[in-house]
């Protein structure tokens, strides 16, 4: 088996977890108490959904997941919510005082008291796996627990499970709206710490999703539940190939191989289509060509940036539902002729394609329409450097005046960690810039002609 352990850290991570597991349960026909009426092979653990669920002797399915937050309120909602019987009580770990939006509290002061408890729980989950493939880590960059504790945990996971891949689904601070003033600080500190510990990080920004909910789903005032359900669909598409049999299956390590050209450049952009409300879907049936084309619209992306200004290094298209390879080939050919998609010149313009015959499922009564086919595009583009540049600019404005720095120093950090993190991000921006520069310019011409 190629099992996958999900780790949900902090409020954002836990709430994304709620949406994801709600959707997985619907997709696999698992009831909120973990029973699965359709499962004929009770106790036999070779079904493909067992990558995400363990099966007990009595036929109960338990998620391979750990929920961690340094304050109790959000996890208490899981403990008393509709899925309270689904999770093992020891998988829900909450502390007494929160990280107060402070990376240093999450990473040093409070985080260090909980990290061993969490690792112990993860170890128990890992022991139940026959061939653990890796970890999916859900968190936000802006919060104290999501930034501080998650980075501490990832450092420790690298030590204990060195070879296992770690993929992140991370909420990136939105350009305009922020939940806290110090989000930029937390984000650069955590990015700096986890850059070498994460293999691939799918960033999502709340504002981009907020706009999608307003524009495509006609939700006038989207709540976090609306946002998380949309994120759930994306995560479900990314993990569908691990949970279902399919024609072209893609596993975790395959994502990295195809999306990450250099270890540091591991922040793919995610786009999902079709995102339409039930009223609209009633009148239109979207073809493979239309949903593929929609993926290249900046408006459908999960991070605010413009790929038309950047170059693509790699591109994965994950289809699910009623899709045949012939249509996909035609759609991609069409996109290549119509759109101005520019690939870096050192990379072949190939698209990695995955097809899963399981149609997309939606949560009943939610905003998204039930459709027969959907696609999730993961692309590594140099345009995402715009997002880093925006963040760095905000940090510079605050750090020039040393605003809010005393909160971090008071929790045991040193001021030089800020400048180190800022330098590392400057290097990251430069890395993206260099990757996009054409290699065959200037003096390389003679060598380029040899081939």
UniProtKB/Swiss-Prot annotation:
Cysteine pairings via disulfide bonds: none
Subcellular localization(s) per the UniProt record: Cytoplasm, Cytoskeleton
Gene Ontology process terms (BP): microtubule-based process
Annotated Mg(2+) binding sites: 71
Molecular function (Gene Ontology), one example: structural constituent of cytoskeleton
Main location, first listed in the record: cytoplasm
Residues that bind GTP: 11, 71, 140, 144-145, 179, 206, 228
Active site as annotated: 254
UniProt site (Involved in polymerization): 451
EC number: 3.6.5.-
The protein's enzyme class: hydrolase
Residues with N6-acetyllysine modification: 40
Keyword entries, A-Z: Acetylation, Cytoplasm, Cytoskeleton, GTP-binding, Hydrolase, Magnesium, Metal-binding, Microtubule, Nucleotide-binding
Post-translational modification: Undergoes a tyrosination/detyrosination cycle, the cyclic removal and re-addition of a C-terminal tyrosine residue by the enzymes tubulin tyrosine carboxypeptidase (TTCP) and tubulin tyrosine ligase (TTL), respectively. Acetylation of alpha chains at Lys-40 stabilizes microtubules and affects affinity and processivity of microtubule motors. This modification has a role in multiple cellular functions, ranging from cell motility, cell cycle progression or cell differentiation to intracellular trafficking and signaling.
InterPro entries associated with the record: Alpha_tubulin, Tub_FtsZ_C, Tubulin, Tubulin/FtsZ-like_C, Tubulin/FtsZ_2-layer-sand-dom, Tubulin/FtsZ_GTPase_sf, Tubulin_C, Tubulin_CS
Cofactor(s) this protein cannot do without: Mg(2+)
GO CC annotation: cytoplasm; microtubule
SMART domains reported in the protein's UniProt record: Tubulin, Tubulin_C
Residue segments, region Disordered: 432-451
Catalytic activity: GTP + H2O = GDP + phosphate + H(+)
Family indicated by similarity: Belongs to the tubulin family.
Subunit structure: Dimer of alpha and beta chains. A typical microtubule is a hollow water-filled tube with an outer diameter of 25 nm and an inner diameter of 15 nM. Alpha-beta heterodimers associate head-to-tail to form protofilaments running lengthwise along the microtubule wall with the beta-tubulin subunit facing the microtubule plus end conferring a structural polarity. Microtubules usually have 13 protofilaments but different protofilament numbers can be found in some organisms and specialized cells.
Function: Tubulin is the major constituent of microtubules, a cylinder consisting of laterally associated linear protofilaments composed of alpha- and beta-tubulin heterodimers. Microtubules grow by the addition of GTP-tubulin dimers to the microtubule end, where a stabilizing cap forms. Below the cap, tubulin dimers are in GDP-bound state, owing to GTPase activity of alpha-tubulin.
Protein name: Tubulin alpha-2 chain
Source species of the chain: Homarus americanus
